[in-house]
């Protein structure tokens, strides 16, 4: 707030009506009446003139006005409502929602409007309402979702990242050792995006339809000619699929992406993949490996190069740090991390969570790669190359 001696009484009172009692205390009556204010305006009564009339020290009076204004601003800050939207992986949506509601019940001072949807609801509305209209206010103060292309494309959410709208406020200085070691550094070095976990992609091999082929144990194996038209891919899961394309490109170039297209037999939802009998190999989120019987024709393979991951992002607006503080602490905390890791097999970045990966490697394309490439254009090129391979 800014108060100067030259401001008119009318402008002060109209902008800061909470100052009326302060004026009343020194004998100014009727300032809640527009007609009185207009008359003072016509007489060009400034704050300095008013204090001369009342024989008050203007320099001592201004802090009293500022205190009245500040007290109301503090009250306003205390009741501001934060907004949270999450698109959560289906297996953990309900337990996370229940945990959050319990947390809110224990912390009555948190004021938040929230909606935690299943991930299949999709992100199309963000492109329509937030990105195309360039209206970041349409996005919740906190937004949780996977979204590999959405968050890194400079024409999509990437443009808001460059403006410094988001800030990692989790306070986690070092990610879980599964994501911070000699092979992987997942934490955003620019401090814009925070993450709560990842969705790893693994293989399920149906040995009954290998027809003499060896069990593929690496991404490189899937690109071999013998696995042409033999693999189911989660194309409908755009986040994971785009992440797979980018990682294959980084490892094996556009030829590798085309070979992955050649390997495509069918495009199924992960839940359908478990029942599919034709593909020799299905690529799916690690969670669905729970459904594979220990004894049977199907074998769960953790790729030798590592499970390709699609991060679960948590975007928080820097301007809403105060309103989001306790919500950030919960969503980035160990309780949520344990739920992700144990109920969803989605490894958590929280340093104290024991992830269900048992030291097995995970593949992350890397921040240097992301910052040195136009990710939106690269994903489009990879998609085109994949389709070329699939059409052969």
Across the structure, where does each feature detected by a protein language model lie?
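Early extracytoplasmic/lumenal segment of secretory-pathway proteins
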Residues: 73-155
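A structural signal for short loop-to-beta-strand junctions that line the ligand-binding cleft
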Residues: 132-134, 140-144, 168-202
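Short loop->beta-strand "edge-of-pocket" segments that line small-molecule binding or catalytic clefts
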Residues: 220-240
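A bilobed periplasmic-binding-protein/Venus flytrap-type ligand-binding module shared by bacterial periplasmic
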Residues: 202-209, 309-322, 339-340
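Short beta-strand->loop
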Residues: 163-174, 294-308, 318-319
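Extracellular/periplasmic juxtamembrane helices and adjacent flexible linkers that interface
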Residues: 76-79, 322, 329-392
């Amino acid at each position: 707030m800014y108060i100067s001696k030259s401001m008119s009484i009318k402008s002060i009172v109209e902008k800061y009506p909470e100052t009326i009692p302060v004026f009343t205390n020194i004998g100014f009556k009727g300032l809640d009446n527009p007609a009185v204010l207009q008359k003072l305006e016509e007489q060009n009564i400034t704050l300095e003139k008013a204090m001369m009339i009342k024989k008050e020290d203007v320099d001592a009076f201004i802090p009293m006005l500022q205190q009245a204004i500040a007290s109301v601003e503090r009250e306003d800050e205390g009741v501001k409502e934060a907004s949270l939207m999450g698109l959560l992986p289906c297996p953990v949506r309900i337990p996370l929602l229940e945990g959050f509601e319990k947390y809110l019940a224990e912390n009555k001072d948190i004021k938040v409007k929230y909606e935690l949807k299943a991930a299949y609801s999709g992100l199309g509305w963000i492109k329509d309402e937030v990105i195309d209209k360039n209206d970041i206010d349409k996005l919740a103060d906190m937004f949780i979702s996977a979204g590999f292309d959405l968050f890194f494309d400079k024409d999509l959410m990437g443009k808001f990242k460059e403006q410094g709208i988001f800030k990692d406020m989790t306070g986690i200085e070092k990610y879980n050792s599964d994501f911070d070691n000699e092979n992987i550094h997942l934490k955003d070095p620019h401090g814009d995006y925070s993450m709560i976990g990842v969705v790893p992609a693994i293989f399920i091999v149906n040995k009954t339809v290998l027809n003499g082929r060896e069990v593929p144990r690496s991404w490189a194996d899937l690109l071999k000619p013998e696995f042409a038209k033999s693999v189911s891919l989660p194309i409908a899961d755009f986040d994971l699929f785009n992440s797979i394309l980018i990682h294959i490109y980084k490892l094996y170039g556009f030829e590798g992406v085309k070979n992955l297209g050649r390997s495509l037999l069918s495009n199924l939802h992960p839940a359908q993949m478990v029942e599919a009998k034709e593909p020799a190999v299905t690529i799916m989120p690690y969670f669905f490996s729970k459904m594979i019987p220990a004894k049977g024709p199907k074998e769960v393979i953790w790729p030798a190069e590592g499970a390709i991951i699609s991060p679960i992002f948590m975007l928080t607006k820097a301007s809403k740090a105060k309103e989001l503080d306790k919500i950030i602490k919960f969503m980035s905390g160990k309780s949520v991390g344990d739920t992700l890791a144990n109920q969803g097999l989605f490894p958590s970045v929280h340093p104290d969570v024991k992830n269900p990966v048992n030291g097995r490697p995970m593949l992350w394309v890397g921040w240097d790669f992301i910052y040195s490439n136009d990710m939106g254009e690269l994903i489009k090129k990879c998609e085109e190359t994949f389709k070329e391979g699939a059409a052969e």
